[in-house]
């Protein structure tokens, strides 16, 4: 996560309504239409089903209350508006309660192609559709419960699991490999890199391998992990994650597949 934000949260009024400007609605519309076109034949069916169930459209930035109600009807999950950056402990606590934390601001036009921190487009368009899928929603909630139980000493490696699944995961389907991670489906550069470029590495998902794989948040990903089903994700929570993390620490990290970030 970035250490500080140049954005401030959009706050709701007394009725819980978030007021977005015409320019902010236009940015949402441009992002939505571009990604929906680009994702055809690239994102998994469960993702598109979720977009439909949430009633997302290019018309305007969606209201969190509408997203929350539709998610609750689908899987009992919900959302909670938060500042751009929150502590890992708060993040995992919300997941454990079945609430996905959402940044409420939308990127400015100068950041329309790439923003390092999560905005409402990444959060709602990227994360929320799959939370209408019961197996996936169960995985996310149980993952939060495990993270809360394990505590801050395990956060670094827990975020690696989150990064290579929830953010940048791929899934094999009868129709071929498809993307589901929010960092892919909400980004044109990541979508093209993962699904068109042929310049990245695809690995079968293996928990120990993931736990030993470093990542950078500010580059197109060089490595993606591929699952066979969303049930495979939920099975992660049946493992002794704490013991696996301790084992990964003892074994050490794999060499990074990227250059060190310039200081």
Identify what each model region corresponds to.
Residues 1-131, 210, 222-263:
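The feature captures two recurrent sequence modes
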């Amino acid at each position: 996560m970035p250490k500080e934000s140049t954005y401030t949260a959009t706050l709701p009024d007394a009725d819980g309504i978030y007021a977005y400007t015409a320019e902010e609605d236009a940015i949402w519309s441009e992002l939505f239409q571009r990604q929906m076109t680009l994702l055809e034949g690239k994102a998994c069916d469960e993702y598109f089903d979720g977009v439909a169930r949430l009633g997302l459209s290019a018309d305007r930035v969606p209201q969190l209350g509408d997203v929350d109600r539709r998610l609750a009807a689908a899987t009992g999950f919900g959302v909670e508006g938060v500042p751009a950056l929150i502590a890992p402990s708060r993040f995992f606590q919300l997941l454990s309660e079945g609430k996905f934390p959402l940044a409420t601001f939308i990127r400015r036009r100068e950041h329309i192609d790439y923003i390092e921190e999560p905005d409402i487009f990444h959060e709602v368009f990227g994360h929320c559709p799959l939370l209408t899928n019961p197996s996936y929603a169960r995985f996310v909630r149980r993952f939060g419960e495990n993270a809360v139980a394990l505590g801050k000493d395990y956060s670094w490696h827990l975020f690696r699991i989150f990064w290579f699944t929830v953010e940048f995961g791929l899934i094999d389907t009868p129709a071929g490999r498809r993307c589901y991670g929010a960092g892919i489906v909400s980004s044109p550069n990541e979508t093209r890199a993962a699904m068109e470029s042929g310049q990245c590495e695809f690995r079968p998902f293996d928990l120990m391998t993931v736990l030993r794989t470093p990542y950078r948040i500010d580059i197109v990903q060089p490595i993606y992990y591929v699952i066979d089903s969303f049930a495979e994700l939920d099975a992660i929570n049946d493992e002794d994650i704490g013991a696996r993390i301790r084992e990964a620490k003892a074994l050490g990290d794999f060499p990074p597949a990227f250059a060190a970030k310039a200081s």
